[in-house]
Structure formats: structure tokens, C-alpha cells
């Protein structure tokens, strides 16, 4: 047990430093190319911080643990929205630009509707489903690139001091590697610790693994807040949620199709269909609707999301 605990701590340290460098590199690139930080957060930063989910879900699917691949994607969306974004909002509520949110939010709900449709109608995620999800990922990237080209940065961003481009790319790349390695150490050794304590695999997937693979987003969000880049944090969370459904699930399903696990029920029905997917929609609606309609996020909103996440975790360990 000592070695897993030590490796768990090493993974956490890698995540913290990796998140710090990744934010520095991403914001430097945003300033250099006059791109709004929220758009950078919704694409470049999201890809880097979603790498752990891609690796964990793909490995799980290939080794016959489809319940982990499935639970990791949904659990990470819930964790990102109701824990990570909630912390960001509760600590530093403020205004957001609704226009910059429309594309990632729209793509998320289109992907989520397709994902839920497959879950409720067949319960089987086949290779064609994975390819459709990957096509959505490509479309999302294209739309964001076009938006970046057509959206000028605010005046203060254009006047910001720029560092060496090679250094910014280096920070971005090294940060992404540290994030991926750190998350891998955290999930592998954290799962060993959880299994030693007798926690079921399905619960591990929706809570522990989801939280572990979402730690890069959490570290990036906290680092962004500390550096005063709240827009980058929110954009990263929403972008990561899109990637969890279209990239993480797309890759794992395309490589190793799986069916929804049936080992947990509520009132005789599949627990995922009764609770997990509805909660995923609920927390994203609570996170995004006020931002789109009012252009701001409030502290009560963040607290409400945190309460939902706490209740979700409690139910997972009691059903």
C-alpha cells in the first residue's frame, strides 16, 4: 500500500506543475495570435487536459472494461461541471461573453443528445457510433478554428507583452506531458487503493476514476484563477466536456465497442439511464444557461452545483 500512496503523491505533483506550465503556454499563445482566452481554453487547453480521459477510456475498452470507459466519460462531464466549474464560480463569480460560449455549448448538447439517444435506444456503443462521435470532434475543432480567425482579441490582450514563441510551445507541450503522466499515476495507484478498500469497479469509474482523470481540469482551473484567467478556466471546462463525449468516447468506442454496464439498478432500472445521464444534462444546463442568458455566473450557482455533485457521489456509494 505504501508504494501506491507514494506514486499517487508523485502524480499529484506532476499535475500541479504541469497545470501551471500549460496555462502559461496557452495564455501566451492566445496573446500572440490575438485569440480570446475562452476560445483557447475551449480547444488547445481542453485537448491537453483531456489526454488522461482518452488514455484511461481507451485502455479500459481494449482490456474489456467497458464500464470504466463509459463511466469515465459521463463521470468526467459531471465532475467538470459540478465540481471544477463550480469551484471556479464559487471562488470568483463574474461576467462571461455569451458569444464565445455558444459554439462549445451547442456542440456539447448535440453530442450529449446523440450519446443519450444511443444509450436509451440500444445501450450498445458500436464502432459506427464511435466514428460519428469522432466526426463531431473534427467538426468542433474546425468551427473553433474558424471562430478564432474571425474573433479579434480585446484591446488589452493585443497590447500584452509577448514571450518567446518557442518557450510558449515548450511550456504547453511539457505541461501536457506532465498532466498526462501525473493523471496516469493518480488513476492507476488511486484505483489500487480504492480496490483495496472494497469499492466496486462501476462506482470507481463514475467517481474515483472520473475525478482522477479530471484533476488536470481542476488544477488548470485553480491555476487559471490564481493567475486571473477565469475565462480560460470556464472555456477549458466546457471544451473538455465536449471532448469527453466526442473524442474520449469516440476513440474508445471506435477501437473497442461496448455496452452500458448493467451491474447497478435503481427501482429495477439501469442506474446510468435513471441517474447518471440525467444528472449530466442537469449540471450542464445549470452551468451554461445563466451564462448564455445573463452573461454572468453567480456564487449561488456554484454552490448549487457543488451540492449536486456531493449528492451524486453519496448516491453512487449507497445504491
Regions found by a protein language model. Name each.
Residues 1-319:
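Hydrophobic alpha-helical segments, chiefly the membrane-spanning helices
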Amino acid at each position: 500500500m505504501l508504494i501506491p500512496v507514494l506514486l499517487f503523491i508523485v502524480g499529484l505533483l506532476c499535475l500541479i506543475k504541469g497545470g501551471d506550465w500549460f496555462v502559461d503556454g496557452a495564455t501566451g499563445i492566445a496573446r500572440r495570435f490575438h485569440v480570446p482566452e475562452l476560445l483557447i481554453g475551449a480547444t488547445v487547453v481542453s485537448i491537453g487536459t483531456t489526454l488522461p480521459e482518452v488514455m484511461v477510456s481507451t485502455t479500459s475498452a481494449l482490456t474489456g472494461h467497458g464500464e470504466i470507459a463509459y463511466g469515465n466519460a459521463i463521470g468526467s462531464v459531471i465532475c467538470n461541471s459540478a465540481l471544477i466549474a463550480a469551484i471556479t464560480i464559487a471562488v470568483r463569480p463574474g461576467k462571461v461573453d455569451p458569444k464565445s460560449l455558444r459554439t462549445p455549448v451547442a456542440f456539447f448538447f448535440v453530442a450529449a443528445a446523440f450519446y443519450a439517444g444511443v444509450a436509451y435506444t440500444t445501450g450498445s456503443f458500436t464502432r459506427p457510433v464511435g466514428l460519428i462521435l469522432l466526426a463531431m470532434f473534427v467538426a468542433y475543432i474546425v468551427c473553433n478554428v474558424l471562430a478564432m480567425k474571425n474573433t479579434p482579441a480585446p484591446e488589452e490582450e493585443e497590447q500584452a507583452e509577448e514571450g518567446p514563441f518557442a518557450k510558449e510551445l515548450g511550456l504547453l507541450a511539457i505541461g501536457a506531458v506532465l498532466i498526462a503522466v501525473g493523471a496516469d499515476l493518480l488513476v492507476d495507484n488511486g484505483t489500487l487503493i480504492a480496490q483495496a478498500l472494497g469499492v466496486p469497479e462501476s462506482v470507481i469509474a463514475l467517481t474515483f476514476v472520473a475525478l482522477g482523470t479530471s484533476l488536470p481540469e481542476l488544477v488548470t482551473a485553480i491555476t487559471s484563477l490564481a493567475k486571473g484567467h477565469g475565462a480560460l478556466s470556464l472555456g477549458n471546462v466546457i471544451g473538455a466536456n465536449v471532448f469527453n463525449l466526442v473524442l474520449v468516447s469516440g476513440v474508445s468506442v471506435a477501437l473497442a465497442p461496448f455496452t452500458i454496464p448493467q451491474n447497478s439498478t435503481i427501482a429495477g432500472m439501469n442506474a446510468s439511464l435513471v441517474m447518471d445521464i440525467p444528472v449530466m444534462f442537469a449540471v450542464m444546463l445549470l452551468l451554461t444557461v445563466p451564462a448564455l442568458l445573463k452573461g454572468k455566473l453567480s456564487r449561488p450557482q456554484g454552490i448549487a452545483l457543488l451540492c449536486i455533485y456531493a449528492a451524486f457521489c453519496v448516491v453512487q456509494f449507497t445504491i
